């Protein structure tokens, strides 16, 4: 029996993690958490009977307490609640599926408590990779990637030494606007943007996929996860989303991980690593697979990717500015307050005005995030 705690159980990754647990009797969900999705939380609590439920919003937490008064699940709230969940002695692995920089402190708390981390929260490594990876090494815990591309690389390098790796090739679908011009992007709507051709994901990450910011964030993460120089990380557009990523070794051999676009596969791989388990669902049928094609990403039109790489090269607090600016810009876009291309402009201007901190600690990272938010709010 493996006990898992989930940060962000009501979102896309969280619900798919619960689906994996639902179909594996030796996975026990001991904790769930959400922002304020009380109805979903109640359903999850009544199905999985966790010991603990953490709700970020205090009013929602009181509502949940009333709803589940007939159960044995303890309800906690706020950051203290998330930290209690992350460090609870009953769990062995912490799934960080929470969106945003709110996930950094609980992830650190989980590491200090000796929990392996099934990492789906991008912000953790993008903004605090220089803090997280040494901490994981110090406490002897594994950072297990849940993102499909990083999981693909993780699987491809299993059993290999880092010195044997020459290049990481991260694949991208290209999103719903692949092939569009800048002029065409001026007219796209929120509804257009949320129609991803291959993956079913949350709203924010779907927008990030359309801007190629998501791929930029994955490059930034890969740098820390696999201890690779940015010059040895390449993005390749693979429109069918069949090859999830590849690794080129120093002898020229390339290992690729292929599969149908199903997020449950990397989730389950992280939960059972280093072992594999049966997973239901579609399988690749090579007799029906007509083509696997590759393209070079259009970095002039889709500026999110080159700006992410620039932020990662500059390092220090610049990745935090990139991430915070994108997060708020996407929120404004989803609220239809700005246009699609304004996302790029907000990121670019935020990075341009920032005076970088070379080696920020966590408090400085969070302060830079708030400063970026305030600057954007004063102008858009």
Q: In which residue ranges do the predicted regions lie?
A:
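Catalytic, metal-anchored helix/loop core of enzyme active sites in primary metabolism
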Residues: 1-380
């Amino acid at each position: 029996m493996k006990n898992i705690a989930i940060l962000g159980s009501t979102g896309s990754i969280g619900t798919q993690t619960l689906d994996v647990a639902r179909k594996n009797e030796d996975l026990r969900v001991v904790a769930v958490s959400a922002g304020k999705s009380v109805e979903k939380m109640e359903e999850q609590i009544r199905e999985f009977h966790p010991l603990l439920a953490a709700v970020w919003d205090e009013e929602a937490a009181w509502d949940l307490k009333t709803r589940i008064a007939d159960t044995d699940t303890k309800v906690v709230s706020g950051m203290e609640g998330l930290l209690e969940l992350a460090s609870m002695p009953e769990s062995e692995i912490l799934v960080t599926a929470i969106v945003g920089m709110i996930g950094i402190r609980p992830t650190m708390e989980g590491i200090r408590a000796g929990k392996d981390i099934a990492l789906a929260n991008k912000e953790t490594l993008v903004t605090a990779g220089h803090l997280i990876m040494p901490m994981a090494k110090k406490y002897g815990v594994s950072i297990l990637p849940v993102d499909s591309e990083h999981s693909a690389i993780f699987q491809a390098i299993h059993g290999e030494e880092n010195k044997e790796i020459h290049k990481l090739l991260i694949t991208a679908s290209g999103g719903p606007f692949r092939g569009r011009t800048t002029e065409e992007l001026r007219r796209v709507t929120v509804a257009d943007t949320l129609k991803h051709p291959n993956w079913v994901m949350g709203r924010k990450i779907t927008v990030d996929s359309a801007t190629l910011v998501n791929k930029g964030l994955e490059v930034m993460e890969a740098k820390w996860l696999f201890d690779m120089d940015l010059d040895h990380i390449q993005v390749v557009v693979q429109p069918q989303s069949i090859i999830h990523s590849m690794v080129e070794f120093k002898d020229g051999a390339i290992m690729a991980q292929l599969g149908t676009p199903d997020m449950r596969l990397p989730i389950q791989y992280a939960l059972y690593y280093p072992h594999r388990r049966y997973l239901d669902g579609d399988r690749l049928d090579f007799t029906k697979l007509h083509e696997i094609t590759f393209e070079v990403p259009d970095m002039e039109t889709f500026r999110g990717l080159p700006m992410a790489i620039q932020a990662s090269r500059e390092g220090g607090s610049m990745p935090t500015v990139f991430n915070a600016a994108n997060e708020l810009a996407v929120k404004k876009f989803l609220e239809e307050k700005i246009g699609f291309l304004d996302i790029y402009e907000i990121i670019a201007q935020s990075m341009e005005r920032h005076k970088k901190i070379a080696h920020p600690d966590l408090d400085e990272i969070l302060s830079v995030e708030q400063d970026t938010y305030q600057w954007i709010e004063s102008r858009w």
